[in-house]
Amino acid sequence: MVKKLRSIAAFGLEVADLYTGAGLSRSAAALSYFLVLTLFPVLLCVNYFIGLFHLNLEQLLVSLDQLLPQGVLGIMGDYLRYVAGSQSSALLLAGLSTLLLSASSGLRTLFLAMDELYQNARPHVLRRLALSVVLSLLFLLTVYLSVVVIFTGDWFFGLLRQHLPRRIAQLVPLELLSRLWSWLRYLLLFCFVLLLVLIVYRAGAPRWVSNREVLLSGLLAAGAIVAASVLFSWFIGMSSRYALVYGSLASLMILLVWLYFCGNLLLLGVAVNRVWTRRRKK
């Protein structure tokens, strides 16, 4: 038992040493900067999806209330209400262009940190650029699917009851799924986050890193990001003096700190995987 605890402690110290030595907190700060630039174009696209399907904005914000800090939701809600009256194709195109530019830049920052951790030779610039653009489009698809999952509710299951063949409707437990959906959709959102993290980890890791190791580190990172977001939301909700310290900038500071935490956890998952693979080789 003592030997196992020593091994865990040594593993943790090795991860901490690698994390600080590689300057991952600096990379997380750069990543959070690009995430801020990505957020508002993403909200433009979300606004377009809401208007396209005539969905309820308040339902989206209420569904995310348990996952995101209140300050982050405040910024998102204010911005979405601001752009809600505009469904301009030019505005959407500008948002998509900015999204691809900022998201691909953030991904390249993440890949550079992963190259340093794994001691990879940096690939051709155009190849890395193309990969980051493709992953940015995948990120946009994930956002779209997340919006669909959030807005899927009782109306959707009622629609299935009306249009599915009777035999199929009897086989599928629609009533049970309808009651459990308020929790199942959070599980689906976690799966979307996990899938995106796994794809990024796999794309940035060298080929000698096994899929099993990528899966375990991705699970750790995705779970940590979700858990940290919930805890951070609870902590901010309990802190009544936060707005007194930062005034009108409180929501923006909460957003920046939350994105910085998420960036650190994403890179921490890479550091854990690197130490794991290095120990496996010994």
Regions inferred by a protein language model and the residue ranges of each:
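Membrane-embedded alpha-helices and immediately adjacent juxtamembrane helical segments
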Residues: 1-282
